[in-house]
Amino acid sequence: MSDQQQLPVYKIALGIEYDGSKYYGWQRQNEVRSVQEKLEKALSQVANEPITVFCAGRTDAGVHGTGQVVHFETTAQRKDAAWTLGVNANLPGDIAVRWVKAVPDDFHARFSATARRYRYIIYNHRLRPAVLSKGVTHFYEPLDAERMHRAAQCLLGENDFTSFRAVQCQSRTPWRNVMHINVTRHGPYVVVDIKANAFVHHMVRNIVGSLMEVGAHNQPESWIAELLAAKDRTLAAATAKAEGLYLVAVDYPDRYDLPKPPMGPLFLAD
């Protein structure tokens, strides 16, 4: 083989699950633990070359993922089992590959995505949990999930989410299109399930923080609509904690035919 002859490059997509409680977010950063850094290290070991991954959504410190999607390019030709079982063998126990799929050159985990879906899990009980303490948010006041659901429906469609946007958000626009938002109760768990084309920084956690005030009867049902119209972050409730938030699914055009495993988290039925 001549020096000029290039090896073929393969583009691979992976579905990733992780417990974010011990990580300083998804994105690789100097001197702190990140999910991206651990995944790239494991992939590089299997590929026997440096690997850089691109993700669908960069989750914050303490936030979890059951449906994160990444892609990477490599000259390494490996069987699917190497990219799943082999990579998992090199990952810490709180990160796992769920599926693998070869994708065409035009695929991008972030820019090809048409929607992202999050679930926020509230453990609504008088006493705090121990086993799932880093996987749910504890809220001791009784919550009316049906009231929260009704209040949330004003967020559907395209809206300016300035009132639910972090001050440090770097997005060029506060406008987002919410496709669905449902609030349901499953025993002691209250689940806020929201899907949108994209999210401004802390959008889900800020929405949930205000919905909990409505669910606890500290604010009227109309309050969420009033906040949305006000376009003022200072009027809304405090940001809900990170530990209850999960990135559960990312939508892509059907032509990519990516796997769609159960969304989870695993202790919840779909």
UniProtKB/Swiss-Prot annotation:
Q: Where is the active site?
A: D60 (nucleophile)
Q: Which CDD domains match?
A: PseudoU_synth_EcTruA
Protein name (database record): tRNA pseudouridine synthase A
Q: What does this protein do?
A: Formation of pseudouridine at positions 38, 39 and 40 in the anticodon stem and loop of transfer RNAs.
Q: Which InterPro entries match?
A: PsdUridine_synth_cat_dom_sf, PsdUridine_synth_TruA, PsdUridine_synth_TruA_a/b_dom, PsdUridine_synth_TruA_C, TruA/RsuA/RluB/E/F_N
Keywords on this record?
Isomerase, tRNA processing
* Lineage: superkingdom: Bacteria
User: What catalytic activity is recorded?
Assistant: uridine(38/39/40) in tRNA = pseudouridine(38/39/40) in tRNA
Sorted alphabetically, the Gene Ontology BP terms of this entry are: tRNA pseudouridine synthesis
E.C. designation(s): 5.4.99.12
Q: Where is this region: RNA binding?
A: 107-111
Q: Which gene encodes it?
A: truA
Residues at which substrate binds: Y118
* Annotated site location: Interaction with tRNA: R58, R78, R110, R126, F139
Species for this entry: Shigella boydii serotype 18 (strain CDC 3083-94 / BS512)
Can you tell me which family this protein belongs to?
Belongs to the tRNA pseudouridine synthase TruA family.
Q: According to the UniProt record, where is the region Interaction with tRNA?
A: 168-172
Cross-referenced SUPFAM superfamilies, in alphabetical order?
Pseudouridine synthase
Q: How does it assemble?
A: Homodimer.
Q: Name one Pfam family in it.
A: PseudoU_synth_1
- EC class (word): isomerase
Q: Which GO terms describe its molecular function?
A: RNA binding; tRNA pseudouridine(38-40) synthase activity
